[in-house]
Amino acid sequence: MISFLSGCLYPEDRLAQNRVPYKDQIAMVQSAVDQFQEAEGGILPLKTKENETPIFQKYLIDFKKLSPRFIAEPPGSAFESGGIFQYVLVDVETDPTVKLIDLTMVDAIRDLKLRIKFFAERNGYPPYKEPLDQEKGYFSLDYDKLGYNNTSPFVVSPYSGKNLSLFIDTKGEILVDYSPDLYDALKKFKHNYKTGDDIRYLLVENYDFVPAFSVPYTVKDNDPIFLKE
């Protein structure tokens, strides 16, 4: 799930300058994407990804196709320029729109995956703790067995700045629990989402970021729950 990144993610001395501002840079990339699509007969400047790639990580913008004709170079906030954002597209069929993946969460996910790998090599299975959804195969993890010493790894939400917990599925993928952000969004924004709808799009519609490394959620009694597909 994080295979599109490798090595050192971003030099520390470039973090501050390449984190903000990003609003103008999103607009610049959106303009370049629109021009490319018009010039290329509807084709989008995308990197090739496997069909099973999670939807919000599937449509990565290929800046090599945009530069230098439509944009001088990738914006400073882009991963390709040493920044901490991966530029992606959503609504590719109807209204291709530029959004961001916050890559600061990748280090925590990668570290957890490595610890699980070493544990599983010794024990034959990950250190599952409790089922979060037995039917979907989502589990919490016993972090003490992974050497976290009474602490739990987390990622910082690009939406709220809250600490978001992590969990695992039966395929070994590490996933981010966006339920706190979804709960807030359901209360904050007017919407027509009902049980059975994927409410992650409420975040996409109202923020510049996509909920990367996530699973589908829906709403029941005004609360976010895992979507039963």
Residue ranges and their predicted role:
Residues 3-7:
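C-terminal motif of bacterial Sec signal peptides marking the signal peptidase cleavage site
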Residues 9-12:
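Bacterial signal peptide processing site
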Residues 16-23, 27:
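Juxtamembrane membrane-water interface segments immediately C-terminal to a transmembrane helix
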Residues 25-41:
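N-terminal alpha-helical signal peptides/signal-anchor transmembrane segments
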Residues 45-109, 116, 120, 127-229:
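Extracellular/periplasmic head regions of type IV pilus-like filament subunits
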